């Protein structure tokens, strides 16, 4: 609910179409689920749309598509809805619409290549919300395994190349991750450190309905050190002990730490210390086709293009357009 969402960075309820869905094409999945409920509904897999079809009046009435098996399709209907996601895996579109992030790795579905957005542009639409600040979630450094909510499953702190605490990883987590990644003073080197009690929780975490984070131990990316001093020495983190001491002092005092983090976890180091080398990774784009509140794709005169709709990450973020920031994906679009 909204009350709990605020601790992750949500600042207002979003009830508008166009809010992005996390970068993985969820809007397309939702649409496919609805289509297959109809007796004559049919989903054609491994098939890419190549272009839209317009009639003499300029209305979008269908599209051409080509399957991986060589089959060609011409489909017509009353309207077309673009729901193919963002463009985080398209280097050229990143350079054009999010140049500040063009050189970074995006940890997202490989299908996020922006074809739907380009089709909308070719049909007369335009892109809005370019080059806004993008969020990032935590991943393991080696395998890029998603660790977005490890701070809930296994309370700990995140440190940089010197062992300095990077900040409040609870409040506004995804933007804290993004800022840490962009800050060159951090040396683009990060570790998530936690104690044995948190390690037990991490091995048996059911945050996603299955025990996913145990992979960090199975892959050998979670490493145990006999002491803080040993971890500091082997990982070359000279300030690690001081960062843990400051965190623990705040935990014992029951007060926020210097970064404003409340309820700091006490890191018990008598049984040694666990560390995972981690990497904040960007994972979606927020620029996209301009739409109205009925999900019509708009032309540059802000008029609806007849027969053309859009939903999900293929759209520009209406929440950003309204001067809000990304709400961690909990505000799924009404589209």
Residue ranges with predicted function:
Residues 1-71, 91-92, 251-270:
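Conserved redox-cofactor binding core of oxidoreductases
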Residues 51, 239-318, 322:
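A glycine-rich dinucleotide-binding beta-alpha-beta segment and adjacent secondary-structure elements
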Residues 68-139, 295, 330:
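Glycine-rich loop(s) and the adjacent beta-strand/alpha-helix scaffold that form part
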């Amino acid at each position: 609910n909204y009350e709990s969402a605020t601790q992750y960075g949500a600042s207002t309820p979003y009830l508008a179409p166009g809010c992005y869905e996390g970068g993985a094409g969820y809007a397309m999945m939702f649409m496919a689920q609805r289509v297959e409920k109809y007796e004559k509904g049919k989903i054609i897999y491994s098939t890419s749309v190549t272009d839209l079809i317009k009639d003499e009046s300029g209305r979008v009435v269908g599209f051409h598509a080509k399957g991986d098996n060589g089959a060609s399709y011409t489909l017509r209907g009353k309207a077309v809805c673009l729901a193919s996601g963002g463009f985080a895996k398209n280097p050229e579109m990143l350079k054009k619409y999010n140049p500040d992030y063009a050189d970074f790795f995006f940890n997202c579905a490989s299908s996020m290549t922006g074809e739907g957005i380009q089709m909308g542009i070719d049909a007369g639409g335009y892109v809005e919300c370019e080059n806004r600040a993008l969020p990032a979630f935590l991943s393991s450094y080696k395998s890029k395994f998603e660790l977005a909510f490890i701070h809930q499953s296994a309370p700990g702190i995140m440190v940089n190349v010197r062992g300095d605490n990077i900040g409040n990883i609870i409040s506004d987590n995804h933007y804290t991750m993004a800022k840490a990644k962009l800050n060159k003073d951090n040396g683009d080197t990060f570790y998530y450190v936690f104690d044995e009690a948190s390690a037990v929780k991490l091995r048996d975490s059911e945050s996603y309905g299955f025990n996913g984070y145990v992979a960090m131990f199975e892959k050998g990316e979670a490493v145990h050190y006999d002491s803080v001093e040993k971890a500091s020495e082997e990982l070359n983190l000279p300030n690690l002990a001081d960062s843990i001491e400051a965190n623990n002092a705040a935990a014992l005092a029951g007060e926020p730490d210097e970064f404003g983090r409340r309820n700091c976890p006490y890191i018990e180091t008598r049984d040694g210390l666990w560390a995972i080398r981690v990497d904040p990774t960007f994972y979606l784009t927020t620029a996209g086709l301009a739409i109205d509140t009925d999900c019509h794709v708009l032309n540059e005169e802000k008029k609806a293009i007849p027969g053309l709709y859009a939903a999900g990450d293929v759209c520009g973020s209406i929440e950003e357009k309204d001067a809000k920031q990304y709400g961690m994906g909990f505000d799924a679009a009404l589209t």
